[in-house]
Amino acid sequence: MPMSRPDSAVSLLPDYSLRAHNTFGFDARARVAARIGSPGQFASLARDPRVAGLDRLVLGGGSNVVFTRDFDGLVLLDEIRGRALVREDDGAWYVEAGGGENWHAFVEWTLAEGMPGLENLALIPGTVGAAPIQNIGAYGLEMKEHFASLRAVELATGELVEFDAARCAFGYRDSFFKRDGRGRFAIVAVTFRLPKAWTPRIGYADVARELAARGIDARAVRARDVFDAVVAIRRAKLPDPLALGNAGSFFKNPVIDAQAFAALRAREPDIVSYPQPDGRVKLAAGWLIDRCGWKGRALGAAAVHERQALVLVNLGGASGADVLALAHAIRRDVLGRFGVELEMEPVCL
């Protein structure tokens, strides 16, 4: 796969502003930063005496991070680009993309190349390298369903390591890289398996409604139709980070056991829920937050978005600490009313 630039000496950027590298727009600063354009540059910094002993943070699109303070260490800005069909067989295409590739642009490219499968994940902010960390998902599809493998550099040693799905240990918005592997690796390339026998995922009510509104027969739907529908839905519901700082969905949809759900539904008969294959039930965190009266409310310059209660926004001038205080207040109220603990999606630093 082509990379954005060849291995070369890495220039260090002292006292570097991260405002343009996080979608909340917080003006945190890094003690030092480096732009990384190849796996070899990640590896070289493992042995570089200029940054010996510094904590390290890999940043892609910055759409899943809340800076509550400056970062007193080395921030590695992943700019590894490139995307290509690396092989195919009778059943599938295998496509690889660099960790610094924009996720949405990559999804659009796969469709333009006639390789559908990722269209339900359109317009999710961030980079390809961040997608496995979070096991991103939307509208009935999780990234892990099309994941083949990834390559990552171990930051402490510079070793290039290959991960299959089992080693990644994917869960709901979760993976090895958020647990035991947190902060240890930089994902430099991800390979996806896209089956040639394409089946549309249009079971979500929002997607079905959008397709119907466009006059598209579900029996004749194309991957591009699903892509366009998802993009339209997300643009209608979610604020553009360039206009209003945010990190997308701030809370995970909680999953509870069937007994707890039965008790909850007895008190809240109109609760929004989604049965899971293992017998548990996923709840809509946005509905819980809305019922607690938080939708559209603000604490200072941090607020809950008026159209989507899952999204916390920076109205202008908010700090990471302000957003975190708002998140804690929401979690407290949801726990008090429903007995359900919300888990935050972004990493708070």
Curated annotation (Swiss-Prot):
Annotated NCBIfam families: murB, PRK00046.1
Q: In which pathway does it act?
A: Cell wall biogenesis; peptidoglycan biosynthesis
Q: What enzyme class is recorded for this protein? A: oxidoreductase
Record keywords: Cell cycle included? yes
Instruction: Spell out the GO cellular component terms annotated for this protein, sorted alphabetically and separated by semicolons.
Output: cytosol
Which GO molecular function, any one, fits this protein according to its record?
A: FAD binding
Pfam families recorded: FAD_binding_4, MurB_C
State the taxonomy lineage.
Bacteria, Pseudomonadati, Pseudomonadota, Betaproteobacteria, Burkholderiales
Q: Look up and give the organism this protein is from.
A: Burkholderia pseudomallei (strain 1710b)
Q: What does this protein do?
A: Cell wall formation.
Q: Does the keyword Ligase apply?
A: no
Which GO BP annotation is one of this protein's?
cell division
Q: Which gene encodes it?
A: murB
**Catalytic activities:** UDP-N-acetyl-alpha-D-muramate + NADP(+) = UDP-N-acetyl-3-O-(1-carboxyvinyl)-alpha-D-glucosamine + NADPH + H(+)
**What keywords are assigned to this protein?**
Cell cycle, Cell division, Cell shape, Cell wall biogenesis/degradation, Cytoplasm, FAD, Flavoprotein, NADP, Oxidoreductase, Peptidoglycan synthesis
Name-wise, this protein is UDP-N-acetylenolpyruvoylglucosamine reductase
